Amino acid sequence: MDALFGDELERAALVDWRPLAQGLHARYLVDEFGAAVRFVAALGEAGDALGHHPRVTIGRGFVDLKVVSDDATFRDGDTVHVVQWVTQRDLDLARSITDVAAAQALTADPASVSQVELGLDTARSATIAPVWSVLLTGDPAGQGLGSPSDEVRDPKGRLPNLWFGDATGEPQRFHVEVYVPAEVRDERLAAVVAAGGTVVDDSRAPGLTVVADQDGNTGILCVA
């Protein structure tokens, strides 16, 4: 299926969900673990009906969900790439999940979802990616998984993705990308500044804002 991007996702009007990095994310609040289990069981049935299922994390008082397709396609010139991204299948699953949550009287908390990725600046991603793939995931297949680049992704979805950027000559080569919903971006940025951080580069804001701590270590606040 075709990968869906910005305007297409916005037109879907999935009020319980937020696009972060490659997938759609949602959080539903639950009173107890048993309620979480019942919710997830119902999601299993909904997913079976569509032949597609979410990734699920159960925590104290919440159920976190991510929907993404492993076989999304997009065209770059004459080349067709198969990637991990959102497709129509994911929109259909997200709507079905929203219906299940409504039937169980669960409340969505979309402003609380987040996604973390790691970045490493290098001029030799093809050379070093195999090392990071086996170190992080234990599997060489993590290199380029669901991506046309050398990006490292855990085949089992346990770890943050590691992507490779251009070498800049700066002493810090690792940095963290934090994806947040658009409606909490300003609040999160203000909290960083209030804690002593500084804005280093907001030329691509609100999509990307580079911030730094008091020692000059940088991170990137992202809105997908």
Where are the regions a protein language model picked out?
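Amphipathic alpha-helical segments
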Residues: 32-43, 126-139, 188-193
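N-terminal beta-strand motif that seeds the catalytic metal site of vicinal oxygen chelate
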Residues: 102, 106-127
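Hydrophobic, helix-prone linear segments
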Residues: 1-35, 49, 63-64, 70-71
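Vicinal oxygen chelate
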Residues: 68, 75, 84-88, 107-110, 115-123, 169-189, 209-212, ...
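Short, flexible turn/loop "capping" segments at secondary-structure junctions
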Residues: 17-21, 110-111, 168-171
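A cross-kingdom feature marking charged/low-complexity
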Residues: 2-3, 61-110
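A common structural junction motif
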Residues: 44-54, 100-104, 136-140, 194-200
